[in-house]
Amino acid sequence: MLNSTFGNGKNGALKVVEHLGYIQIDTLSVVARAHHHTLWNRLPDYQEFYLNELLEKDKTIFEYWSHAASYLPMCDYRFSLPRKQHYIEGKSHWFDQDKKLNSYVLDRIKAEGALQSKDFEHKRNTLGNWYEWKPAKKALEQLFMEGKLMVAKRQGFQKVYDITERVLPKSVDTSTPTEKENAAHLIKRAVRANGLVEEKEIAYLQPKLKTAIKNELQNLVESGFLIEIKVENKSETYFSTPEQLTVLNTLKTSGEIHFLSPFDNAIIQRKRVQNLFNFDYQIECYVPEAKRKFGYFCLPILYNNQFVGRFDPKADRKTKTFYIKQLHFEKGFKPTQNFETLFNEKLNTFAKNKFTLHERETLPNYI
């Protein structure tokens, strides 16, 4: 985000997705859905319709699974194929699958064209009284994970599915990558997005590729593509490229403030953030209310190159009012007058961009 040069408009949004490698999709919309929030932080003129145009019209991004549901660059499509094959071979997506129902849903979409889950709401005599919406939604998700269906577009936030042959551009590379290619892709994506990374960060949720990632890291170091880095007072070994390290060493702080989504790529690996920035963060909407320290949906505050605090927002969409329920700064951080000016300016921009105005319910707390 510091000194980002992604340009503007829809093409700028595509560059962000390609640079980060994925943008997580999330249903929570306390202030803004995660995918829009993440892009807005890197592209100040971002408009929410950009993503659907890139997905539906330009076909330069697609929806699939990274570590979670995500938008991914179409140029990386082939790297989704090993996971899809895993599902074809029998893995179920969070639930037991019904192969008869899967075939019925797939046949309908082949015959009728793109459909949403709501198109399967009513009971069908052809399948008997056991057929209802929830099993059909599971079938859609299973077929999606297998790669037989793709999300052709979104209507509101609802997925519209079609068979892959009608969605995927013919020019896209559909060759299945080897383990070595997949490992190299994950390594290069992580370094490009983060500047420097640990082996365990790259292998996160990739148990079948741990050995391949370890071997490919060594190969890339030996070839000179990567260099090993030791961070002062840290035992871990990090990896970067010579070019990235030059950028990191010459990067100037921008004097900007960013309010990050809890699912932003910069914050999603909590242990990395704690280790490098000494910022202990978790989203507390999944924590029982009595045990929350910072609020239901606290957002990290990034100032220059430091995480300096967090605040818990709430949007009243009926009255177009944006509230700060709690505001906490990190121990040792004392806001200057300049910071307060920048914070208020950013808060106004953020709130007006989403909800027109803001109010503050509590004063800052120092922790």
Describe each PLM feature range.
Residues M1-I367:
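Long, charged, low-complexity, helical-prone intrinsically disordered regions
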